[in-house]
Amino acid sequence: MGILTLNVEEKIKIISKNTAEIVTIDELRKKLEENQKLKGYIGFEPSGLFHIGWLIWAQKLKDLVDVGVDMSILVATWHAWINDKLGGNLDKIKLAGQYAIEVLNAYGVDMSKVRIVYAEDLVKDSNYWALVIRIAKNTSLARMKRALTIMGRKAEEAELDTSKLIYPAMQVADILYQDLDIALGGTDQRKAHMLARDVSDKLGKKKVIAIHTPLLIGLQGGQRMEGVEEDDYLASVKMSKSKPETAIFVHDPPEVVEAKLRSAYCPKGVVIDNPVLQINKYIIFAKDNATLKVERDIKYGGDIEFKSYEELEKIYSEGKLHPLDLKLATARKLNEILDPIRKKLESKTEFTLLVEELEKGVTR
């Protein structure tokens, strides 16, 4: 179905699929009804290896492009430098950015319809830094510290060096400077997006619509504790490249993907915080007309094919599907998705070398 044949509700259905929240859906509907050409962005720190959790926002980026949003990708090199990623080596950070763009291209994002913006393009403009200062002037120190969770850091880590405090103001400036309608990110970016919405009123800037995608839980699963905020809990158990044992990377060979899924947390009949089911919901069934074929011996019920995630979850929650059967089927399907990405990366020596180097010592 082409962009011109989609009505407003069809666009909203595509945009909202597999999102944690849209702030606000009414603002999005209003802009779509006015037939405005919307501008959006996703920013990421090029900080290492690309794991499958990032495919969730990559799919949403693809969805937004497919419904006609003018999307840009901000390769946040300076932000990664401030955040001490890759030892603060800007050359490595830039190469990691190029590697991530290659992954997105191989995944199926139409890069001819996406603008690539590097942090260097923004920071060379004095107007950008003037905006950073204006944002800082309109934000309390306490709120700026609370926003450090967007970096994967705690508020007290602001004491490490003063640049950490500048980071949230820079991320808000990234949004306001580009005059965006939509900011896309994981739920861990919520505090920056909410700050951007609040500050925009004070500065007379356009109020951005925030689209947040879920964070994929790590393969270890999660242990929920009373009194812990949902955002803090999810940030602590999410799949992370700094905890490689919890993650599946897009370059992992098929046998490694299968081995990791075999050992993943996946209790029989348990749906909550089940990483194997989440991979199905947010990655496998995020694609149009997706199916999952589970191969079983006839004495265990024979093969079964699921045509929706809802059907899979129902059968699994009823205890009618063995965890190992689910894991092996998920590994086969996930490897089908990862295969073109692996081939693309293997065809370029510089990315093969980068992956090897990063695997030797994973940094923050």
UniProtKB/Swiss-Prot annotation:
Protein location: Cytoplasm
Catalytic reaction annotation: tRNA(Tyr) + L-tyrosine + ATP = L-tyrosyl-tRNA(Tyr) + AMP + diphosphate + H(+)
InterPro entries registered for this protein in UniProt: aa-tRNA-synth_Ic, Rossmann-like_a/b/a_fold, Tyr-tRNA-ligase, Tyr-tRNA-ligase_4, Tyr-tRNA-ligase_arc/euk-type, Tyr-tRNA_synthase
This enzyme's EC code(s): 6.1.1.1
One BP annotation, GO: tyrosyl-tRNA aminoacylation
Main location class: cytoplasm
Entry keyword set: Aminoacyl-tRNA synthetase, ATP-binding, Cytoplasm, Ligase, Nucleotide-binding, Protein biosynthesis
Residues reported in the UniProt entry to bind L-tyrosine: 41, 167, 171, 174, 189
Enzyme class: ligase
GO molecular function: ATP binding; tyrosine-tRNA ligase activity
Pfam families reported in the protein's UniProt record: tRNA-synt_1b
Top-rank taxon: Archaea
Disulfide cross-links: none
Motif ('KMSKS' region): 238-242
Any single GO CC term annotated in Swiss-Prot or TrEMBL for this entry: cytoplasm
Residue sites binding ATP per the record: 241
Function field: Catalyzes the attachment of tyrosine to tRNA(Tyr) in a two-step reaction: tyrosine is first activated by ATP to form Tyr-AMP and then transferred to the acceptor end of tRNA(Tyr).
Family: Belongs to the class-I aminoacyl-tRNA synthetase family. TyrS type 4 subfamily.
Quaternary structure annotation from Swiss-Prot or TrEMBL: Homodimer.
HAMAP family assigned to the protein according to its UniProt record, in alphabetical order: Tyr_tRNA_synth_type4 (MF_02009)
The name this protein goes by in its record: Tyrosine--tRNA ligase
Organism in which the protein naturally occurs: Sulfurisphaera tokodaii (strain DSM 16993 / JCM 10545 / NBRC 100140 / 7)
Originating gene: tyrS
